[in-house]
């Protein structure tokens, strides 16, 4: 069952394009890119999610990431 997002594909793709341009500008390796993305996710969770819910949200995020990977 596909997941429906409240954000348009165009909006998401626009942000991804801008972020990719910044990473390219800094010649970020895949390892550095993943480190930056992980730090962003951690900061978003820590700054916007109640402490009691952080682990649950992080686990759901991790599950969504694994589900999105191509086999």
From Swiss-Prot:
It holds the Pfam family DUF1414. Disulfide bonds: none annotated. Coiled coil: none annotated. Signal peptide: none annotated. InterPro entries: UPF0352 (IPR009857), YejL_sf (IPR023202). Belongs to the UPF0352 family. This is UPF0352 protein VC_2040.
């Amino acid at each position: 069952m596909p997941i429906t997002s409240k954000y348009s594909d165009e909006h998401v793709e626009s942000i991804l394009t801008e972020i990719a341009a910044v990473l390219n500008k800094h010649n970020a390796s895949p390892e550095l890119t993943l480190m930056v993305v992980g730090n962003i996710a951690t900061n978003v969770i820590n700054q916007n999610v109640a402490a009691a819910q952080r682990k649950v949200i992080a686990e759901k995020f991790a599950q969504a990431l694994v589900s999105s990977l191509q086999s």
